Swiss-Prot record:
This is Hydroxypyruvate isomerase. Catalyzes the reversible isomerization between hydroxypyruvate and 2-hydroxy-3-oxopropanoate (also termed tartronate semialdehyde). Does not catalyze the isomerization of D-fructose to D-glucose or that of D-xylulose to D-xylose. Also does not catalyze racemization of serine, alanine, glycerate or lactate. GO terms for biological process: glyoxylate metabolic process. Keywords: Isomerase. Belongs to the hyi family. It comes from Escherichia coli (strain K12).
């Protein structure tokens, strides 16, 4: 049976962040993920998770100056100390909240450096993070993102991510495979998820175009959900989409799985 995790950074945006946990539970979710927990008190997050009987499934490493347009710093030479501080913060929250997956947004390709410098920096940072997370029995994830939504993002495809995993050489580094992003960049969703199932550590869903809930676009999620159910993937499926109206009104797609 598929297990869906509500991405509270995108769902239930009609409510204050801490109120979204209760709304997710009321709508039948048993897991939640969110991008950045760092502005919230750990004890407060533990309380809203426990009081709503929710499992925290995923959060991201700190990603630099988000308001200024940064989308990660792992590939930027000269930011290594900041990156390592972010790894420590992510682990501190994961220990307290109980999640076993942390996603790394690698960042936009920086100007002024050679491709070799950028790649070496990224590999070294990911290797450091993976080794630190391995001590905590936590998976490190890297997420390819389409370059239409985030122009200049450094990691945009599955094969690029697979090559990066090989170069880093840590068994707890896997792909966060976002079906929406990869539909925009590659297509071949079924074949990719089937062929590289052992390299996928987390799945996320949204339809295309407009990144709405399943059933609002071109992706055949009825079919893909069967593919996922029949695969070896047994993790959470993160619902990281933009509701086309309200979150509750757009959840009919989930009725067969509640």
């Amino acid at each position: 049976m598929l297990r869906f995790s509500a991405n509270l950074s995108m769902l239930f945006g009609e409510y204050d962040f801490l109120a979204r946990f209760e709304k997710a539970a009321q709508c039948g979710f048993r897991g939640v993920e969110f991008m950045f927990p760092y502005d919230y008190d750990i004890e407060e997050l533990k309380h809203v998770l426990a009081s709503n009987k929710l499992e925290h499934t995923l959060h991201n490493l700190p990603a630099g100056d988000w308001a200024a347009g940064e989308r990660g710093i792992a590939c930027i030479p000269g930011r290594e100390e900041e990156f390592r501080d972010g790894v420590a913060a992510a682990i501190r929250y994961a220990r307290a909240l109980g999640n076993k997956k942390i996603n790394c947004l690698v960042g936009k390709t920086p100007a002024g450096f050679s491709s070799e410098q950028i790649h070496a920096t990224l590999v070294e940072n990911l290797r450091y993070a993976a080794n630190m997370l391995m001590k905590e029995d936590i998976l490190l994830l890297i997420e390819p993102i389409n370059h239409f939504d985030i122009p200049g993002f450094h990691l945009t495809g599955t094969r690029q991510a697979l090559k990066l995993i090989d170069d880093v050489g840590c068994c707890n580094l896997k792909i966060q495979y976002d079906i929406y992003h990869m539909q925009r960049m590659e297509g071949e969703l079924t074949n990719t998820m089937t062929q590289w199932a052992d390299k996928i550590g987390h799945l996320q869903i949204a339809d295309n175009p407009h990144r709405g809930e399943p059933g609002t676009g071109e992706i055949n999620y009825d079919y893909l959900f069967k593919v996922i159910e029949n695969s070896d993937y047994n993790g959470w499926v993160g619902c990281e989409y933009k509701p086309q109206t309200t979150t509750e009104a757009g959840l009919r797609w989930m009725d067969p799985y509640r």
